[in-house]
Amino acid sequence: TELLNETESYWGYSNTAYSIGIIISGLIAFRLSEKFLAAKWESILFPLVAMAIVTLTILYFPNAQMFLVFSALVGMLSQLKEVPESVFLQETVEENNLVNVYSVLEVISTLAFSVFVLLMSYITENFGISISFWLSAICLMIEAILIYIRRDYFR
């Protein structure tokens, strides 16, 4: 709200833009499913790098309308990353263990999300929004590097 000079209600628009991005990328993934299957690690790597770039770009264009566009882009990219991740899990985990794996992943994901929201709130409050965005971009790039290093595992 400080960076964009918007009210708290603006974040509802931002969340809506993010959700629209998810819906659009779902349609894209449906249309390009064969390409995702043929290039799993690339289909995970590209959205990670692109999300890091978009995250940093937001800092240099602190404009409320552009932020909505960037929110939609991040929604699209996050969904495009999740589709090949899900396919990878389904192909590598035995069918009778799939429910357990998804359950554990959901618990870990929810717990990690909660902890990182708290941590990033603290960092933003004490060090500023720019540091939070930079940390987010760095984390995305670390994940991208790990995917690249382990790319043979995805074949």
Show which residues each predicted segment covers:
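C-terminal transmembrane bundle of multi-pass solute transporters/carriers
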Residues: 1-155
